[in-house]
């Protein structure tokens, strides 16, 4: 199996689980030194190269049966859309020529009609290129992913913890169907076993649908914080909202803006056909608040397996240094309420 995006949030969690399942795993990374401190690095075949370089992709594809396509340029350069399409075409053509049996791509939930954001449009086009490659492909379309260290979770967390009152853009009213990272990994792993005649996109999501503002208040309950009064301000554009999120959270604007643009739409499943191809986990899909509770437990215990920082834009001044401890860059807010008794004069 070949995993692209192995240094990212999802890829860094998928690789060790594939190894635990007994698979031979290769990873294609631009810089092998980024795997220096990864515990599973010695157990995989590391190919150094850029996905935009067709020759590097061909080297990585040799002898591969399943390709996991987990890369996207959300935090990259301004021309990320062109770069993403070039990479997708390279992977599609190389996989076809090398006789790969299955491509698994993690895309994003999006509305069936209407104008998409640049970020969602690009991810949709990548999925189409892979589906048209001639290689059996499954596109798993997920919305907000909840797990310790995920960009979406950290954005909800910091907005809720930092602001006692939430003057928010209108997307706080959008309906969201979050999914636990544990369940995303379940679908990714099982997708490799799907019969070759299956070649299509599937929506995936958890059991709950909330407005985005309700996600924040659900987090507040699990974190022991008071629920936040939220006032929607329709005047904030996605760009301005991205600046605002960058100001009050550690999420950089280049990551915040694409997420916010996708939140302009309702991010909910339009179909549940995935159940007929990949059944849910035996214990069921995690409810949102359970996923939040588990994520908080991991963060408080310092057991964050991967973080959005793994895939952050290199060189950002806010990045922790290599010499910093694992917990550097995180924040924790506790809420204490003190009630003073009063006595009447005698």
Go through each PLM region and give its residues.
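A hydrophobic C-terminal alpha-helical subdomain
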Residues: 236-329
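Conserved beta-loop-beta element that borders a ligand/cofactor-binding pocket
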Residues: 107, 128-151, 155-158, 162, ...
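Glycine/proline-rich active-site loop of Rossmann-fold NAD(P)-dependent oxidoreductases
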Residues: 147-155, 191-202, 225-228
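Substrate-binding strand-loop-helix patch
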Residues: 175-182, 204-222, 232-243, 283-287, ...
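N-terminal Rossmann NAD(P)H-binding glycine-rich loop of SDR-like oxidoreductase domains
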Residues: 1-21
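Substrate-positioning beta->alpha
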Residues: 151-152, 171-192, 200, 214
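NAD(P)H-binding glycine-rich loop region in Rossmannoid oxidoreductase-like domains
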Residues: 33-98, 108-115
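Conserved small/polar residues in nucleotide/adenosyl-binding loops
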Residues: 335-342
């Amino acid at each position: 199996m070949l995993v692209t995006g192995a240094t990212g949030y999802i890829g860094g969690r998928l690789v060790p689980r594939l190894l635990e399942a007994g698979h031979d795993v290769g990873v294609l990374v631009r810089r092998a030194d980024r795997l220096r401190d990864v515990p599973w690095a010695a157990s995989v075949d590391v190919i150094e190269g850029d996905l935009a370089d067709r020759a590097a992709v061909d080297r990585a594809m040799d002898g591969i049966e399943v390709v996991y396509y987990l890369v996207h340029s959300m935090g990259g350069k301004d021309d990320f859309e062109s770069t993403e399409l070039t990479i997708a075409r390279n992977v599609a053509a190389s996989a076809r020529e090398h006789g790969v049996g299955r491509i698994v791509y993690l895309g994003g939930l999006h509305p069936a009609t209407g104008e998409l954001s640049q970020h969602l449009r690009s991810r949709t086009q990548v999925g189409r290129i892979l589906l048209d490659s001639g290689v059996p492909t499954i596109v798993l379309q997920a919305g907000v992913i909840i797990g310790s260290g995920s960009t979406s979770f950290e954005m909800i967390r910091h907005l809720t913890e930092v602001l006692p009152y939430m003057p928010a853009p209108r997307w706080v009213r959008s309906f969201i169907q979050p999914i636990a990272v544990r369940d995303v990994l379940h679908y990714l792993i099982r997708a490799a076993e799907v019969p070759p005649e299956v070649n299509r996109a599937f929506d995936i999501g958890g059991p709950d649908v909330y407005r985005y503002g309700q996600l924040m208040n659900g987090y507040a309950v699990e974190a022991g914080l008071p629920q936040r009064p939220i006032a929607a301000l329709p005047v904030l554009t996605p760009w301005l909202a991205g600046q605002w999120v960058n100001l009050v959270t550690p999420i950089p604007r280049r990551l915040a803006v694409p997420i916010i643009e996708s939140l302009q739409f309702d991010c909910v499943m339009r179909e549940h056909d995935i159940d007929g191809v990949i059944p849910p986990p035996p214990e069921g899909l995690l409810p949102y608040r359970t996923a939040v509770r588990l994520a908080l437990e991991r963060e408080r215990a310092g057991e964050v397996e991967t973080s959005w920082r793994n895939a952050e834009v290199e060189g950002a001044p806010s990045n922790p240094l290599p010499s910093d401890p694992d917990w550097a860059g995180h924040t924790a807010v506790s809420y204490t309420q003190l009630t003073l008794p009063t006595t009447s004069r005698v």
